[in-house]
């Protein structure tokens, strides 16, 4: 919400216009024995100065964006190659089609990171910015929904007990993610050479919709999965959602959903911050949450690799040799 600037200095005319309280002027009588009340003009000017925040993700952060993009593309491409490699043991991972789509989502996110990076030029149009935010949040929404699906269906994915998962459910999840990106796509533009969301009264409904979508998917979805897991365990109703290393993904986006909601409340004046320091802390948290979300494109392939390694290490030795290469693709194909 602003560059790292010193507080604005007021002009001499502004300094001279600092006046007494109206009540003091009303009660003031011109008498030689009376004296003017003492006023701390420096404190008044300090309070009147605008509040500026230091933006961490400015032009100097361009190497971070580029490095995250390159590493994310390389790592995700490697995971995709191993998942689709013929006769490779990762094809025995439970729900490997969902895992492949997670890698695709991470790759798409990595590709658009440079589009939204600062410091790449000052002649950006609104079209690349809108497309960048669409893919940015669309891939993140899709990954979150796929993780929720993977956790809910659990080991059933590996047994081929859900025939329509590969096509029908995947199309539905990606379609829902695309629809959820419409608000931020329509409410983003290039400003001063930077791709940024537009905050205006006319677009307040779009901003509210986007904030609610982020809060629901990045915050409420993982909390719901944890709650369902604990509730079913307490009531003895079954194992509940399938917990695994992939749930770490939500750590990278959970702060973004929370801080984005707080920022919207402040902009809408539903939540008033008492001091300039509080506003600066909120802006800092917004930058840190965005940086953490960017790091997910590098962490996601590593989480997928670790999950597949753990799953196949315990699964492959227990299968006879001919059954080791009967992947879930064959099982789903035989049922269709």
Swiss-Prot record:
One of its GO terms (cellular component) is recycling endosome. The chain crosses the membrane at residues 64-84, 96-116, 130-153, 167-187, 208-228, 245-265, 288-308. One of its GO terms (molecular function) is C-C chemokine binding. It comes from the Eukaryota. Residues 85-95, 154-166, 229-244, 309-336 are cytoplasmic. Residues 1-63, 117-129, 188-207, 266-287 are extracellular. Its main location: other. It is found in: Early endosome; Recycling endosome; Membrane. Glycans are attached at residues 16, 27, 33. Disulfide bonds join 51-276, 129-195. InterPro entries: Duffy_chemokine_rcpt. It is a multi-pass membrane protein. GO terms for biological process: chemokine-mediated signaling pathway; inflammatory response; regulation of chemokine production. Keywords: Disulfide bond, Endosome, G-protein coupled receptor, Glycoprotein, Membrane, Receptor, Transducer, Transmembrane, Transmembrane helix. The keyword Transmembrane helix applies. Belongs to the G-protein coupled receptor 1 family. Atypical chemokine receptor subfamily. Atypical chemokine receptor that controls chemokine levels and localization via high-affinity chemokine binding that is uncoupled from classic ligand-driven signal transduction cascades, resulting instead in chemokine sequestration, degradation, or transcytosis. Also known as interceptor (internalizing receptor) or chemokine-scavenging receptor or chemokine decoy receptor. Has a promiscuous chemokine-binding profile, interacting with inflammatory chemokines of both the CXC and the CC subfamilies but not with homeostatic chemokines. PANTHER family: ATYPICAL CHEMOKINE RECEPTOR 1, DUFFY ANTIGEN/CHEMOKINE RECEPTOR. This is Atypical chemokine receptor 1.
């Amino acid at each position: 919400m602003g560059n790292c600037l010193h507080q604005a200095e007021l002009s001499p005319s502004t300094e001279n216009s600092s006046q007494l309280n109206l009540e003091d002027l009303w009660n003031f009588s011109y008498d030689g024995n009376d004296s003017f009340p003492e006023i701390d003009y420096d404190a008044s000017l300090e309070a009147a100065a605008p509040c500026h925040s230091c933006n961490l993700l400015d032009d100097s952060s361009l190497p971070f964006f580029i490095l995250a993009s390159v590493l994310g593309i390389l790592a995700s491409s490697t995971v995709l190659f191993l998942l689709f490699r013929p006769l490779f043991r990762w094809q025995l991972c439970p729900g490997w089609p969902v895992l492949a789509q997670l890698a695709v989502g991470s790759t798409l996110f990595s590709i658009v990171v440079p589009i939204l990076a600062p410091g790449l030029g000052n002649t950006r149009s609104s079209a690349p910015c809108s497309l960048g935010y669409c893919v940015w949040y669309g891939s993140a929404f899709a990954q979150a929904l796929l993780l929720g699906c993977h956790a809910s269906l659990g080991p059933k994915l590996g047994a081929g007990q859900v025939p329509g998962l590969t096509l029908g459910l995947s199309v539905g999840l990606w379609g829902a993610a695309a629809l959820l990106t419409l608000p931020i796509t329509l409410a983003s533009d290039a400003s001063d050479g930077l791709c940024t969301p537009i905050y205006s009264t006319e677009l307040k409904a779009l901003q509210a919709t986007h904030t609610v979508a982020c809060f629901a998917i990045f915050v409420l979805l993982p909390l719901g999965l944890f709650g369902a897991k604990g509730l079913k365990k307490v009531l003895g109703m079954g194992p509940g959602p399938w917990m695994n290393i992939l749930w770490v993904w939500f750590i990278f986006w959970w702060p973004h959903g929370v801080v984005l909601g707080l920022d919207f409340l402040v902009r809408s004046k539903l939540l008033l911050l008492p001091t300039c320091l509080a506003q600066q802390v909120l802006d800092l948290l917004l930058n840190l949450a965005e940086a953490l979300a960017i790091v997910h494109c590098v962490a996601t392939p590593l989480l997928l690799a670790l999950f597949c390694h753990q799953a196949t290490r315990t699964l492959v030795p227990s299968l006879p040799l001919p059954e080791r290469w009967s992947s879930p693709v064959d099982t789903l194909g035989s049922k269709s």
